[in-house]
């Protein structure tokens, strides 16, 4: 029956086979007339056998030979089972160890403070925060009411921190105390005028100190550490007022100038957290700033506390309003490098940023926040290190550390390099601060650990 009229299912295969055979014979003449038709093996599709994993394993065991596909001996089987069991136990151990390490970071470290001075109070009941009267300098004078001069040489040193000093600050306004932190997990307060000794230490972190900041009234200071914690200490008693446990390393902390209860923390996960210790909910967190794309490097408030500046490893500098998660200005350029340190000029509307291309750049504090094309300070080597910078009390000079153990000083108005002092130790000088009341005294320290005073 033809294809148009339909077909019979019972004879369809026979017809198709005969038609195919006749066509094949016609094409090849009489070659196959006397031979029986045998379909080739290529036309026969054998069904592939599928085995389970256990069946395949059983088949491999029955194979003979010493090759890679040979049979398995009972000892090899036992060895493989033992190795699998050992691997599972090892995975469980590694997982448990990771959990223990995570828990160890959250373990409370014993917070203690020891006083090493002669007496904690004077005859009138005042602590060491009260500025001394028996020194040649009026420590209550306004900061910019005197003229500063260049430091010329190293005059003395403090033991500092044997494994390296990572944070260094004068007590604001008076400068009769030095606050330092180091890789030995310890914070120390030093006497600057009398016995040049450590007055008190603060122990409460289990990893190196990252940053230290005084509050405006100097009654407290903030500390951040690689143990992912931020603590607020009482400067005189050594007691911890507030402690925060974070999920990322706090790279920098900054206290708001007009409000000692507020502070910001820059994290290595690119976020900036704004805290108020008067708020009880959520550990006092009032705002999160999350526009940066990489780790926060430095934070600095405007002198009036209305805004703050942030620098990040994403090679941008951003300016923020308080408690508004939208930056009002982003400073970026294709040739711009990371800027690991920020500082504000004491008398003019500028802030400076230490750059990884061995330069210090100046930016305006007024809207548009443009970079000053002529106020660029260079000559030192800062690439690869988070080196700090400081201004003299009257704003005439700017000084910076150096990766080759030197202290550089420039003229602020002309950007001219005035001098550099070789610091003992032959290690990078990463911490620098200018005395707020002395005309030419600068402290500096770094990986060597000792704190040097230049005058």
UniProtKB/Swiss-Prot annotation:
It holds the Pfam family WD40. It is found in: Nucleus. The keyword Repeat applies. InterPro entries: G-protein_beta_WD-40_rep, PRPF17, WD40/YVTN_repeat-like_dom_sf, WD40_repeat_dom_sf, WD40_rpt. Keywords: mRNA processing, mRNA splicing, Nucleus, Repeat, Spliceosome, WD repeat. GO terms for cellular component: catalytic step 2 spliceosome; nuclear periphery; Prp19 complex; spliceosomal complex. This is Pre-mRNA-processing factor 17. It comes from Saccharomyces cerevisiae (strain ATCC 204508 / S288c) (Baker's yeast). The lineage of its organism: Eukaryota, Fungi, Dikarya, Ascomycota, Saccharomycotina. The gene is CDC40.
């Amino acid at each position: 029956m033809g294809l148009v009229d339909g077909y019979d299912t019972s004879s369809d295969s026979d017809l198709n086979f005969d038609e195919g055979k006749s066509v094949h014979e016609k094409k090849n003449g009489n070659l196959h007339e006397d031979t029986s038709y045998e379909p080739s093996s290529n036309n026969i599709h054998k069904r592939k056998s599928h085995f389970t994993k256990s069946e395949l394993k059983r088949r491999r065991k029955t194979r003979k030979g010493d090759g890679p596909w040979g049979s398995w001996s009972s000892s090899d089987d036992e060895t493989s089972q033992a190795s699998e069991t050992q691997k599972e136990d090892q995975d469980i151990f590694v997982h448990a160890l990771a959990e223990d390490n995570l828990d160890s970071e959250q373990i409370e470290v014993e917070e203690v403070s020891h006083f090493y001075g002669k007496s904690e109070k004077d005859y009138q009941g005042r602590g060491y925060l009260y500025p001394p009267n028996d020194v040649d300098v009026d420590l209550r004078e306004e900061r910019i009411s005197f003229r500063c001069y260049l430091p010329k040489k190293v005059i003395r040193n403090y033991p500092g921190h044997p494994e390296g000093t990572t944070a260094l600050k004068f007590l604001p306004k008076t400068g009769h105390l030095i606050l330092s932190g180091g890789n030995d997990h310890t914070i120390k307060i030093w006497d600057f005028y009398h016995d040049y000794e450590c007055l008190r230490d603060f122990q409460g972190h289990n990893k190196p100190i990252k940053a230290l900041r005084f509050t405006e009234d100097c009654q407290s200071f903030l500390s951040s550490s690689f143990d992912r914690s931020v603590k607020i200490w009482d400067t005189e008693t050594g007691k911890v007022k507030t402690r925060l446990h974070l999920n990322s390393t706090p790279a920098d902390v900054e206290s708001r100038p007009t409000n000692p209860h507020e502070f910001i923390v820059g994290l290595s996960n690119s976020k900036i957290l704004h805290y108020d210790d008067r708020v009880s909910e959520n550990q006092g967190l009032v705002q999160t700033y999350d526009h940066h794309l990489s780790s926060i490097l430095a934070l600095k408030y405007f002198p009036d506390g209305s805004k703050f500046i942030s620098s990040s490893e994403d090679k941008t500098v951003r300016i923020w309003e308080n408690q508004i998660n939208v930056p009002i200005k982003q400073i970026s350029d294709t040739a711009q490098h990371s800027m690991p340190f920020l500082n504000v000029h004491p008398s003019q509307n500028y802030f400076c940023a230490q750059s990884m291309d061995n330069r210090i750049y100046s930016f305006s504090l007024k809207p548009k926040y443009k970079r000053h094309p002529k106020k660029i300070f260079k000559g030192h080597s800062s690439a690869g290190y988070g080196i700090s910078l400081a201004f003299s009390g009257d704003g005439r000079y700017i000084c910076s550390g150096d990766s080759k153990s030197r202290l550089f000083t420039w003229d602020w108005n002309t950007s001219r390099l005035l001098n550099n002092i070789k610091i003992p130790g032959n290690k990078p000088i990463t911490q620098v601060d200018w005395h707020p009341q002395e005309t030419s005294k600068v402290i500096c320290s770094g990986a060597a650990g000792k704190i040097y005073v230049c005058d």
